């Protein structure tokens, strides 16, 4: 019953990495070169790979699950509903994120240093959302999952209404950051619950669906 809270801690790490990684790599690319920024990525990923080998314990396997048994979860209607939901929600979130800087620059008309600060606020709010998600899913997962798309929809509409006012925009983006953190946990929970008999395959489908949504969302937006 504590699984949602444990997963939320993992997403906190992911969000923290984005909060720190985006400004650091942007700085390296602008002040040194794009090649050095890519080298930074390489070194960071290599360190994570080594740390995973050294510090992450092997997960005990209760019973071996065949490839056929894992693929059979794709016959479940709930799995496909979850895959579609993850693709659409992640597409919406990253579609918005892909043009947020441009929107702040052209519509809200704020300088780039302020945009960087707003992006930092969004990232930090994302971490808060991750922490909240674990508690919300533990209390009432169904309610959290059902309400989230509507909360995102209302927030996106508010962006267009208050787009010219920086103060209001910061508040809405702060709320969106929290909602995005909650939504990320909700999406993983949906797919994991749809296929509890094949957790590794379910996690793979979550990442595939999320990446597909990111690709479609950023391309369309």
Task: List each language-model region with its residue ranges.
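Juxtamembrane intracellular "pre-TM" segments in multi-pass secondary transporters
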Residues: 56-83
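Extracytoplasmic gate region of multi-pass secondary transporters
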Residues: 80-119
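Intracellular juxtamembrane helix-capping segments at the cytosolic ends
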Residues: 1, 182-195
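Helix-to-loop junctions at the C-terminal end of transmembrane segments
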Residues: 129-141
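Small-residue (Gly/Pro/Ala) motifs that create kinks and tight helix-helix packing interfaces
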Residues: 17-29, 101, 133, 216-221
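A late C-terminal transmembrane helix in Major Facilitator Superfamily
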Residues: 194-221
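Helix-loop-helix hairpin linking two adjacent transmembrane segments in secondary transporters
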Residues: 9-56
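C-terminal transmembrane helical hairpin of 12-TM major facilitator-type secondary transporters
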Residues: 143-187
């Amino acid at each position: 019953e504590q699984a949602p809270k444990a997963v939320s801690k993992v997403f906190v790490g992911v969000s923290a990495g984005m909060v720190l990684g985006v400004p650091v790599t942007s700085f390296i690319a602008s002040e040194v070169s794009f090649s050095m920024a890519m080298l930074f990525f390489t070194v960071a990923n290599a360190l994570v790979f080594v740390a995973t080998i050294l510090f992450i314990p092997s997960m005990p396997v209760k019973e071996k699950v065949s490839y056929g048994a894992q693929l059979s979860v794709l016959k479940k209607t709930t799995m496909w509903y979850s895959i579609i939901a993850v693709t659409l929600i992640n597409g919406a979130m990253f579609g918005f994120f892909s043009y947020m800087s441009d929107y702040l620059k052209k519509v809200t008309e704020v300088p780039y240093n302020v945009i960087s600060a707003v992006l930092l606020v969004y990232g930090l709010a994302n971490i808060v959302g991750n922490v909240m998600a674990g508690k919300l899913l533990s209390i009432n997962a169904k309610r959290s999952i059902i309400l989230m798309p509507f909360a995102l929809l209302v927030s996106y509409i508010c962006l267009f209404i208050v787009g010219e006012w920086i103060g209001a925009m910061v508040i809405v983006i702060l709320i969106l950051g929290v909602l995005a953190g909650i939504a990320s946990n909700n999406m993983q929970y949906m797919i994991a619950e749809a296929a509890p008999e094949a957790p590794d395959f379910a996690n793979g489908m979550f990442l595939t669906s999320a990446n597909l949504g990111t690709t479609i969302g950023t391309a369309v937006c």
